[in-house]
Amino acid sequence: MSGHSKWATIKRKKAVNDAQRSKNFAKLIRLIEVAAKQGGPDLAGNPGLAEAVQKAKKNSVPNDNIDRAIKRGSGLTGEHINYVSLVYEVKAFDGVALLVECLTDNKNRCAAGIRSIVTRSGCSMVNPGSLAYNFKRKGIVVLQDRDANGNLLSEDLVLSAVLEAEVDDIVPTGDCGFEIIAEPSNLSAVCNALRDSGIQYRSVETVYVPNSTVSLPEQKYDRIIRMIEALEESDDVQGVYTNLSGKDLACE
């Protein structure tokens, strides 16, 4: 998502090598399988699956891999998909909090791996609910900067398109585009309203948004960033969200 966005998740600013790309593919395939299992194989009727497929395509996952993942997840191949979704809460220092979103087939392995990284970083895992109140779950739709006719979008045009779809906010991104913030349950209605108005969007995503952000001096800031990067390397981790603000933090 746009680097000008105020909705901060973690974006790592370094090249992705082949090994990391393969790991990312595996995570995205897992996300598709779980979404298909939960809501069925129809993208039009399953916003979670549509979001997972869109994210996979954005990261160049081959269409054949995506199709097979949908079939596996929806039970069409007879394979058993047994992943669970978990969110771990991490207390850092000076008011910094993190939510680590995981998708795993082994809770014990997942928890042990997260705890090891967090402890090495001088931070701690806390009980569910201890820090989650610092964040809200939100859906974000990133728009193209032009409509289907090639005209630059205006905020009035976007607003009129989604007026009935119950959005929370429309945020200019600084590159002539906009982001629409909405409740996750309203994402399907928002996307349908945009399509009906001829407005194209780049991505749809559900994220944890901090209620407020915290700044740290450089040394402590770098420690948090290193921990986040280590967490993102875990096979079980789907996303890391924090209330820390800084140069390395931007929406995907």
Curated annotation (Swiss-Prot):
Q: Which biological processes are named by the entry's GO terms?
A: regulation of DNA-templated transcription
Pfam families tied to this protein? TACO1_YebC_N, Transcrip_reg
One MF term from GO for this chain? DNA binding
Pull one GO CC term from this UniProt entry: cytosol
Q: Where in or outside the cell?
A: Cytoplasm
The question of whether Cytoplasm is a record keyword is answered with yes
Per the record, the domain of life is Bacteria
Keywords assigned: Cytoplasm, DNA-binding, Transcription, Transcription regulation
**Would the keyword Iron be found if you checked this record's keyword annotation?**
no
Protein family membership: Belongs to the TACO1 family.
Record-linked NCBIfam families:
PRK00110.1, PRK12378.1, YebC/PmpR family DNA-binding transcriptional regulator
Q: What is this protein called?
A: Probable transcriptional regulatory protein TWT_266
